[in-house]
């Protein structure tokens, strides 16, 4: 579970609100974290094996899009962060004597405090990087649709995601543990920067990503209408697929992390009270404990739920391969009509070979749409670029295709 309270636990003194949640059934809480994290790792491994098996039956992609690299990086960050939660919870359950020495000021063994700080910073860093990568994904898909030239720079995204994650994590840790671990958490002036650096990437994703996704969906609709000047049923289905994917992403993020925001709001409210153990605050205390346990279950499950949002429910099966709907679009050609309508993506010019289309600066419009609807090898919709008329294969019905989503 990714929470700034994990870092505060390493301090010898806790505020009353932190004491309220950290001392309430700690073994049960870490058992829930361990179970949720282990389930995410096991099912994630099954999904990875299933994806590799399905890739073996396809021609390898020549140049993966930047969004594919971004999703792989976000998945890796979430996987390693979840692994940190599993290791931390395992130690908490298996070695209670080791954990008791963490907050002991007079203890001579530095390893308990070192493990506490290291595991807390490890979890915070990787989940922060995951949030930055998800923000980069929203930015990238919007830029791919909107701009007319150039190619996404994955190096810039690496610098942005890892640089900001490391910077905020180090700054929050220095402010929290200054001047030393044995003398930290002596007031809100030390703790607040730690909270800000922890939740800033999360709040950015929850606020900015829906805006970028909405703008992308609007641009995709304009792009599909501009291909032939009409908006066919297949193009409506294509737009619905992209819109559904973005909706699933935000639904997972809100479901997994809204409990963190509610919990921290309740704990901050309790910290402002002169006596948090008053009878009038009993319901708020119970709500804080409840959301604390919900965080322990949902935070490690984020990666699994996001992968299901991207790849579908059948991604966790090693044998089930759902029928795919293959839509072949006509490639764009240089014409007078294109001169009157400037598409938001890179223009394409036909060469001598009628089966090939040369892209000026990057992906064709078909590939751009494929990036948005098929970031995985297990997507329910595939789009292939080909000349000629529109040809639909393996389509039972549009309602069945929407049912698979």
Swiss-Prot record:
- Topological domain spans for side Extracellular: 1-27, 100-124, 175-191, 270-292
User: Topology in the membrane?
Assistant: Multi-pass membrane protein
What are the subcellular locations of this protein? Melanosome membrane; Lysosome membrane; Apical cell membrane
UniProt-listed Gene3D superfamilies: Rhodopsin 7-helix transmembrane proteins (1.20.1070.10)
Q: Where is this motif: lysosomal/melanosomal membrane localization signal?
A: 222-231, 329-330
TM ranges: 28-48, 79-99, 125-145, 154-174, 192-212, 249-269, 293-313
The segments annotated as topological domain Cytoplasmic are: 49-78, 146-153, 213-248, 314-405
- What InterPro entries would the database entry show? GPR143
Q: Which UniProt keywords apply?
A: Cell membrane, G-protein coupled receptor, Glycoprotein, Lysosome, Membrane, Receptor, Transducer, Transmembrane, Transmembrane helix
GO biological process terms, alphabetically, are: G protein-coupled receptor signaling pathway; melanosome organization; melanosome transport; phospholipase C-activating G protein-coupled receptor signaling pathway; regulation of melanosome organization; regulation of melanosome transport
* Alphabetized Pfam families for the sequence: Ocular_alb (PF02101)
Annotated region described as Necessary for its G protein-activation ability and normal distribution of melanosomes, given as residue ranges: 221-238
Q: Name one GO cellular component term.
A: nuclear body
Q: How is it modified after translation?
A: Glycosylated. Phosphorylated.
Main localization, broad class:
membrane
The Swiss-Prot or TrEMBL record annotates one GO molecular function as: G protein-coupled receptor activity
Attached carbohydrates are found at 101, 106
**Free-text function comment from the UniProt entry:** Receptor for tyrosine, L-DOPA and dopamine. After binding to L-DOPA, stimulates Ca(2+) influx into the cytoplasm, increases secretion of the neurotrophic factor SERPINF1 and relocalizes beta arrestin at the plasma membrane; this ligand-dependent signaling occurs through a G(q)-mediated pathway in melanocytic cells. Its activity is mediated by G proteins which activate the phosphoinositide signaling pathway. Also plays a role as an intracellular G protein-coupled receptor involved in melanosome biogenesis, organization and transport.
What is recorded about the protein's domains? Answer: The cytoplasmic domain 3 and the C-terminus tail domain contain the lysosomal sorting signals and are necessary and sufficient for intracellular retention and delivery to lysosomal and melanosomal, respectively in melanocytic and non-melanocytic cells.
Q: Whom does it interact with, and what assembly results?
A: Interacts with heterotrimeric G(i) proteins. Interacts with ARRB1 and ARRB2. Interacts with MLANA.
The text of the family note is:
Belongs to the G-protein coupled receptor OA family.
Q: What is this protein called?
A: G-protein coupled receptor 143
Q: Which organism is it from?
A: Mus musculus (Mouse)
- What gene is this protein translated from? Gpr143
